[in-house]
Amino acid sequence: MAQHLTTEALRKDFLAVFGQEADQTFFSPGRINLIGEHTDYNGGHVFPAAISLGTYGAARKRDDQVLRFYSANFEDKGIIEVPLADLKFEKEHNWTNYPKGVLHFLQEAGHVIDKGFDFYVYGNIPNGAGLSSSASLELLTGVVAEHLFDLKLERLDLVKIGKQTENNFIGVNSGIMDQFAIGMGADQRAIYLDTNTLEYDLVPLDLKDNVVVIMNTNKRRELADSKYNERRAECEKAVEELQVSLDIQTLGELDEWAVDQYSYLIKDENRLKRARHAVLENQRTLKAQVALQAGDLETFGRLMNASHVSLEHDYEVTGLELDTLVHTAWAQEGVLGARMTGAGFGGCAIALVQKDTVEAFKEAVGKHYEEVVGYAPSFYIAEVAGGTRVLD
């Protein structure tokens, strides 16, 4: 796995690429979601946490109107130059569309960015792993601009600009969870977020003798091109059908009883399954938060398992790779629970594992996965850390 960078190394790399010293260095985390999957755009609750894998940045303000972007993850792209006056989506500009989108919407919101800057980026979130490398980069860009141009920016506004970039610049109809988790993250805390009201609690993540193991399928998932938007559309159509008899705006307003009672209104079996997942996953997330606060990790683990079953059978976003990881994890000693995390269709799963069984767990799950899928997965221990911040 890619290494963590010191600020010295970051500054040295910036100097090597741009020939001048960086003004400041920054870090923006990735995220895992403990439970509450595909509920954020359905007006439900989510339970994410920022992690110590993320995106490092170094920046230097320029005297002209040119933005110069460089990513150590895409060295072959070299330095990509963009005029500050021309911030539009261009496919050939690749990863830089994320920072371009953020800067565009900051300007649109009335923030003055009157000069260009040189921007060096290095991420140690595995690409396409579903740990929110794009939201990490969005928040990183916002915090860089905030400090270089002394913008008066509420963090929540920056979170919303990240989501706006994803939806209206990149073209992915994602919810607000990723940006919120990354922008508002705190050390050793998970974020219990109501995506309808944006009310949230920072919940101490006391896992006792257990750790969260991230299991990477190493199958890339492309969110923009996936069935993600299709699932969202199915849920929106289900809401329309339910509105014939119910005064609701989102599936997150319903409970288990209501979805059973009014299921006859949803005319398509697949849409009913999608709606049932959204409603029951929200209920599971409510219960999981109570269990974690009470220190009941066994119940928390069982809810994780139930979440995966629902994502596999009702929401149908898992696939061979994720199912192989999770089903194999369930069979191992010392595992309290396991589920896919993120949008699905590849990417990562997580497991709650007793510390002293982690090595045996990785060996057994890795071996079986390779036999079934044909290549090895990767494993990381999730360290829950703070949100996007200045390093020096």
UniProtKB/Swiss-Prot annotation:
- Tell me which residues bind ATP: 71, 128-134
> Which reaction does this enzyme catalyse, per its entry?
alpha-D-galactose + ATP = alpha-D-galactose 1-phosphate + ADP + H(+)
* Site positions for Transition state stabilizer: 31
Could you list this entry's UniProt keywords, alphabetically sorted: ATP-binding, Carbohydrate metabolism, Cytoplasm, Galactose metabolism, Kinase, Magnesium, Metal-binding, Nucleotide-binding, Transferase
| Enzyme class at the top of the EC tree | transferase
- Provide the binding site for substrate: 37-40, 228
What is the annotated localization of this protein?
Cytoplasm
Q: Where, by residue number, does the polypeptide cross the bilayer?
A: none
Q: Which residues bind Mg(2+)?
A: 134, 166
The active site is formed by: 178 (proton acceptor)
Identify the pathway: Carbohydrate metabolism; galactose metabolism
Protein origin, superkingdom: Bacteria
Q: Which GO terms describe its molecular function?
A: ATP binding; galactokinase activity; magnesium ion binding
Could you state one GO cellular component term attached to this entry?
Answer: cytosol
Q: Name a single GO biological process.
A: galactose metabolic process
| Disulfide-bonded cysteines | none
Give the enzyme's EC designation.
Answer: 2.7.1.6
Kindly give the NCBIfam families that the UniProt entry links to this protein.
gal_kin, PRK05322.1
Protein name per its UniProtKB record: Galactokinase
Organism for this UniProt entry: Streptococcus pneumoniae serotype 4 (strain ATCC BAA-334 / TIGR4)
Q: What is the lineage of its organism?
A: Bacteria, Bacillati, Bacillota, Bacilli, Lactobacillales
